[in-house]
Amino acid sequence: MRRIAVISALPLLAAVALAGCGGSSSNSSAAPAVTVSGTFGKAPAVNIPAEKAGSKLAVETLVHGNGQALGRSDAFLGNYAIYLWSGTSHKLLQSTFKTGGKPTLFAGTLLPGLETALIGQKMGSRVLAVIPPKEGFGTSGDAQAGIKGTDTLVFVVDMIKDFAGNASATGQHVSNGGSGLPTVTAGAAGTAPAIKMPSGKPPANLTTKVLIKGTGPAVASGDTVVVQYVGAIWRNGSVFDSSWKRSQPFGFTIGASPSQVIKGWDQGLVGQTVGSRVMLVIPPADGYGKTGSTQAHIKGTDTLVFVVDILGAYSGTNG
């Protein structure tokens, strides 16, 4: 189905969902050496020699952070620059430092070499990973990204904030909903809340209800927002999507153009505070529109109910 993450502003990161090999060791025997200068949170200056890359994974922690260590099932917010090293030439493929300094969420399975490089690293670290084809996209490469099966990838990653796979809102409980709106009941720690639909008709307009009030900063349009969520259909109460079920927080830029999320999210989450749990009751016009979603069994007339936990909101490169 068309998930909340309908658009990836960073297609190469979206393409790194390959089987991971795990581990946190590094191998510095790859030659010739890549050098990096610059400070954490700023665009790195990367020097790649005009020679062929080595055949082994090379990992170097350029800046040692003192935050939470990245666990295998965690997601994290970070900035990155990716270079393509092809033969004796190289070029920049993507950089969040070059696109307004907006960090992105690393979630799900990473390229094997990138996973090896990052697992166990502490937040606040800058990590260099020189990834040979066998620990990157393999012999098939990625034609859409312009990566051949013989190309080496050079990543420089600034690790900002760690999010556990079962992270939830941390604020003060203020409501369970109800009074004509769905009732929301918290589940076991780290699991999605349950949503019970009322018997009446849904509201005609977008409706928000704060269930847990966080004390963090307010979400502003243009922020990178990290959330957990569960979505259900008002008509029958069926759940059609849940980040908790995947144990994978979701990150997006709110108010982006083109939109990365449905309209009801862009409008309903701005102004809400980090640490909050918010219920969004979203009419069709602010959701999937008249076409709905066949795969998710959402009709064009369906009102959707989301319970969203706001884990973080970030406006710049260093969070």
How would you name each of these model-derived features?
Residues 2-319:
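Cross-family detector of peptidyl-prolyl cis-trans isomerase
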